Each structure stands twice: as C-alpha cells, then as structure tokens.
Design a protein with these regions (language model features):
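Terminal non-domain segments
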Residues: 1, 134-138
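Concave beta-strand-loop units of leucine-rich repeat
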Residues: 1-2, 12-22, 28-43, 48-63, ...
Length: 138
C-alpha cells in the first residue's frame, strides 16, 4: 500500500515508482538527489513533488492537471505523454533542466516563461545524417 510507504527525507540516488496511476496520498522524499521516475502515473492530481530533484520522468501523464513543477529540477523533465498544455505551469528558471513536451497535439495554452525557451523541447529532433569522412593515407 503506497499510502503507508515511507521514504527518508533525502534520497541519494534514483527513485522509481512503477505500477501506480495516481499519487493521491503518496508522501515522497523532500529531496531526491537523483532521478524520480513515475512514468506510470496518468494523473498528477495529489502529487507533491520533492523540493529538489535531479530529473523527473512523468511520461505517462496526458494532462497537466494538478502538476506543480518547482524551479529546483536540474536534469531532464520528461512530460512527453502530455497531449495538452492547457494549465501547465513551467518552471520560471532552469538549472540546466530540459523539459520534453514532444507529445503535445496543440500548443494552445502553452506559456513558456521568458528565458526558458532554450530549455523546452517541443518536437523530437531528427538525427542528422552522418557525412562520410574521407581519410587519405600516404
């Protein structure tokens, strides 16, 4: 039962919580010095994120309802499952975090705070074709 699960205040390492679709009643650590992977969540209602994270995977979310991202996330924020950005509040500054929003079906309601444009990834980048390298041996 997740409601009775307890974590230490600070986790030094990655935390993966799988097989749950809701975070209602879940008490996470105050700080995760690593990655927090909750990709199985389909709703963020009731989710209270740690005050500090090195990365966040919530690729199962299809709606941002209830999601409150804080500024103190330094790695990748994977929200690639979101279909809509309506109501999504992005962090107002980045400590190097890149925010994946590659699943959006429309950009309606998407507000990217000033200075955050370089950190938001809206579409998968096509791999660039490799050019052959010619080496002349004498």
């Amino acid at each position: 039962d997740l409601e009775s699960a307890t974590f230490p205040k600070v986790v030094n390492g990655d935390v993966e919580i799988s097989g749950i679709t809701s975070a209602e009643g879940l008490k996470l650590p105050e700080e995760v010095l690593g990655l927090l992977d909750m990709s199985s969540l389909t709703t963020a209602v009731g989710l209270i994120l740690p005050s500090r994270l090195d990365g966040l995977y919530l690729s199962g979310l299809t709606s941002p309802e209830g999601l409150k991202l804080n500024n103190d996330i330094s790695g990748l924020i994977d929200l690639s499952g979101l279909k809509s950005a309506k109501g999504l509040e992005l962090p107002t500054k980045s400590y190097g975090a890149r925010i994946m929003l590659t699943g959006l079906e429309s950009y309606e309601g998407l507000v990217i705070p000033p200075g955050m444009e370089d950190y938001v990834i809206l579409k998968e980048e096509e791999p660039k074709p490799m050019k052959p390298i010619t080496v002349n041996a004498y």
